[in-house]
């Protein structure tokens, strides 16, 4: 691998987010992405074998359902950039609470280097969960957290959403300005991804 690895986790939206990120990166870089949703310890290990010296970027989906699984996944992947899509109730039976789910999924930051970034959903109470359950002391480097979503308190946010026969449109905002976007898929949940 000659380039960087991005890790993607969350309760929902991992596969769609991985596909969207990879679709953008593939236009410019030789990119490897997780096949379908092979995001378990075995699936991630298989994906890591796909990386070679020609790979410029990798987008690896990392799913967990039990405590300690993310520790093993980040040991394999060592992402330099991470995305935390959402914190829901998937696997709450094994993890006990949304706080514990966030704490376990938040371990994705463990190997972020100095200058690495965690992109986290800033919608609803997810931002508060990330701020309280993903401490920066968990990471080997000094990373930053950037929030995205449909709320204006996010660094990257979408508004003016509407659906039509062509898909879901919205206006994307960041520090450099705004841009009208049309997704070929429907649903505000896809805008959040």
Predicted regions and their residues:
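Heptad-repeat coiled-coil segments of the DHp/HisKA dimerization-phosphoacceptor module
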Residues: 123-124, 174
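Phosphate-binding loop of NTP-binding sites
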Residues: 1-118, 122, 128-142
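Short gly/Ser/Thr-rich phosphate-binding loop of adenylate-forming enzymes
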Residues: 124-125, 163
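Adenine nucleotide phosphate-binding catalytic loops in nucleotide-utilizing enzymes
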Residues: 98-102, 132, 137-193
């Amino acid at each position: 691998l000659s380039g960087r690895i991005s890790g993607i986790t969350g309760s929902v939206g991992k596969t769609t987010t991985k596909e969207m990120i990879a679709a953008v990166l593939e236009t410019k870089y030789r990119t490897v992405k997780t096949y379908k949703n092979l995001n378990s310890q075995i699936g991630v290990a298989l994906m890591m074998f796909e990386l070679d010296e020609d790979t410029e970027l990798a987008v690896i989906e990392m799913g967990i359902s039990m405590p300690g699984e993310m520790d093993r996944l980040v040991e394999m992947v060592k992402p330099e950039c991470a995305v935390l899509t959402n914190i829901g109730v998937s696997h709450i039976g094994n993890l006990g609470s949304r706080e514990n789910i966030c704490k376990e999924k938040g371990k994705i930051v463990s190997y972020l280097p100095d200058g690495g970034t965690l992109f986290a959903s800033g919608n609803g109470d997810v931002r508060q969960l990330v701020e309280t359950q993903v401490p920066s002391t968990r990471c080997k480097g000094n990373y930053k957290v950037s929030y995205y979503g449909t709320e204006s308190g996010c660094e990257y946010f979408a508004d003016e959403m509407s659906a039509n026969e062509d898909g879901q449109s919205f206006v994307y905002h960041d520090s450099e300005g705004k841009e009208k976007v049309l997704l070929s898929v429907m649903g505000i949940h896809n805008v959040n991804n």
